[in-house]
């Protein structure tokens, strides 16, 4: 008996162009025979469902009650046993690498000489359609005994071999379609992402939030401190900006009477790229009338915990080999409290001395803006000394007014706002606050932002006169929060790079 293993052969250093040329020749032959890419095959079963339902059946049970199946999938393995029989493995979209695959068995007696000869010429990566009955092999593997075999789609490019896969990380990002075919972990990551976003939507709807869509093109970039992408609207002959945040439009809806709204969509910020930053990213922002930042913290915690459970199966995660428990109540610290905890060398007097903090920041290579007050300086020192150490979920609260132009000021402590940011594994995940609904105060803060921009702060906000007009009609007391979906998904899926949770991350152009 002779065997031929295409999977092993694929690992040989064969010239890829030669393989492609051979496959194109096969496709040309198919065209001459008739329809090369048929669209009349309708699969009725999925590999994962068959494995779940019949995987525990014995050989005798399957023989006593034959199960007929019709299935399509990509051929990932092929093993020929002489000229009269062959095994192959098909992979479909029904599960991960294990339960999304099923073995097929093709014999000369059952499928005929033509089908047997055709299978010999089929290549790994081809999409096949099969019909037949289930049985168990001697090694107890659930297998389809094929009675009909069809080529649905001819693959022209060879798949990477199973032992090395896509070795280059950039190629994985650039050719995500190949990565998804070959990599079980990649498929699992993006299924978890979908499950988490679906969980968030269900959670919001259960709590009477209405999902809305607000503009992607803005006439004034607003809602966050960030540098926008600019574009030009030809018909209106005006400069426009890809949105950096939907916040001001969502709060206009609260003014209009929609007390609970949320949006899951893309934001764009023309800033740096890193393992935690992508210029195009997904946010979930929500606003609830008659709530405050304390209510928001409890609610945000519940949203994230449920998303982790629905996507991962448990609220106890592992990130980078270290446990992260989202089931426990999240911690809460002030900015100064966090510095005291993680950098206890600083005294109370030093943390309230603006000139001392400026000198310390200089040691970290940070040059604050000339107009920065004590609160902004404390925040900058927190970012250098404490932020990276916030492993467990922690709300940092009571941000200074000067860095929170849209947040409501505290009624009890001068100079701070009812604002929080949520951190875990050393990175920001969410930002929320009791919204500023005093139109005159908001106008004054916008003016301060304009002054900061004139002084050289590129991330300072613009003055939005229409938003002020909306507030002048009256916005009820409101709490609002934004959750970074991509960063949250990095944590839920234990992914070290934000590109790992983006199907098609931004990359430089190919040469």
From Swiss-Prot:
Name a Pfam family for this protein. Answer: tRNA-synt_2
Reactions it catalyzes:
tRNA(Lys) + L-lysine + ATP = L-lysyl-tRNA(Lys) + AMP + diphosphate
Q: Which GO terms describe its molecular function?
A: ATP binding; lysine-tRNA ligase activity; magnesium ion binding; tRNA binding
Details of cofactor binding: Binds 3 Mg(2+) ions per subunit.
| Binding of Mg(2+) 2, residues | 428
* UniProt cross-references to Gene3D superfamilies, sorted A to Z: Bira Bifunctional Protein, Domain 2, Nucleic acid-binding proteins
Which residue positions does the secretion signal occupy? Answer: none
Give the record's GO biological process terms. Answer: lysyl-tRNA aminoacylation
Kindly report, in one word, the top-level EC class recorded for this enzyme. Answer: ligase
Q: What keyword terms does UniProt attach to this protein?
A: Aminoacyl-tRNA synthetase, ATP-binding, Cytoplasm, Ligase, Magnesium, Metal-binding, Nucleotide-binding, Protein biosynthesis
EC number in record:
6.1.1.6
Cofactor(s) recorded in Swiss-Prot or TrEMBL: Mg(2+)
- Family under the similarity heading: Belongs to the class-II aminoacyl-tRNA synthetase family.
Descriptive protein name: Lysine--tRNA ligase
Q: Which organism is it from?
A: Herminiimonas arsenicoxydans
């Amino acid at each position: 008996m002779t065997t031929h293993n295409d999977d092993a052969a694929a690992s040989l250093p064969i010239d890829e162009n030669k393989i492609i040329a051979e496959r194109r020749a096969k496709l040309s032959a198919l065209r001459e025979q008739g329809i090369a890419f048929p669209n009349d095959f309708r699969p009725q079963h999925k590999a994962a469902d068959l494995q779940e339902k019949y995987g525990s059946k014995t050989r005798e049970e399957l023989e006593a009650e034959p199960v007929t199946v019709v299935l399509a999938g990509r051929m990932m393995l092929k093993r020929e046993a002489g000229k009269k029989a062959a095994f192959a493995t098909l992979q479909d979209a029904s599960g991960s690498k294990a339960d999304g695959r099923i073995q097929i068995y093709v014999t000369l007696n059952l499928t005929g000489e033509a089908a047997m000869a055709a299978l010999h010429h089929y290549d790994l990566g081809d999409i096949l359609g099969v019909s037949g009955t289930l049985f168990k092999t001697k090694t107890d593997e659930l297998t389809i005994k094929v009675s009909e075999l069809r080529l649905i789609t001819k693959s022209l490019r060879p798949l990477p071999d199973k032992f090395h896969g896509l070795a280059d990380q950039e190629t994985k990002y650039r050719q995500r379609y190949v990565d998804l075919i070959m990599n079980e972990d990649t498929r699992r990551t993006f299924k978890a992402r979908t499950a988490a976003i679906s969980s968030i939507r269900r959670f919001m709807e259960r709590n009477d939030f209405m999902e809305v869509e607000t503009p992607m093109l803005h006439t004034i970039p607003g809602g966050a401190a960030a540098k926008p992408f600019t574009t030009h609207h030809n018909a209106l002959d005006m400069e426009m900006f890809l949105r950096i945040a939907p916040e001001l439009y969502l709060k206009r809806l609260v003014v209009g009477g929609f007390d609970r709204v949320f949006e899951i969509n893309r934001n764009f910020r023309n800033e740096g790229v890193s393992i935690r930053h992508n210029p195009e990213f997904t946010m979930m922002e929500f606003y609830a009338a008659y709530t405050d930042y304390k209510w928001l913290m409890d609610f945000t915690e519940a949203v994230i915990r449920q998303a982790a459970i629905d996507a991962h199966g448990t609220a106890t995660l592992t990130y980078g080999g270290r446990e992260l428990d989202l089931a426990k109540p999240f911690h809460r610290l002030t900015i100064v409290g966090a510095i005291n905890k993680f950098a206890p060398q600083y005294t109370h007097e030093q943390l309230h001395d603006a000139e001392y903090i400026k000198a310390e920041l200089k040691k970290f290579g940070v040059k604050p803006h000339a107009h920065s007050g004590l609160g902004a300086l404390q925040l900058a020192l927190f970012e250098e000394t404490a932020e990276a150490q916030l492993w467990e979920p922690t709300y940092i609260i009571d941000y200074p007014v000067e860095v929170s132009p849209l947040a409501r000021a505290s009624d009890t402590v001068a100079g701070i706002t009812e604002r929080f940011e949520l951190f875990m594994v050393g990175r920001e995940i969410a930002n929320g606050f009791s919204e500023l609904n005093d139109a005159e105060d908001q106008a004054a803060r916008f003016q301060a932002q304009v002054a900061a921009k004139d002084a050289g702060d590129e991330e300072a906000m613009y003055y939005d006169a229409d938003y002020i007009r909306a507030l002048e009609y009256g916005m009820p007391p409101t709490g609002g929060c934004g959750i970074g979906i991509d960063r949250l998904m990095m944590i839920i899926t234990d992914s070290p790079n934000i590109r790992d949770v983006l199907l098609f991350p931004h990359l430089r152009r190919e040469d």
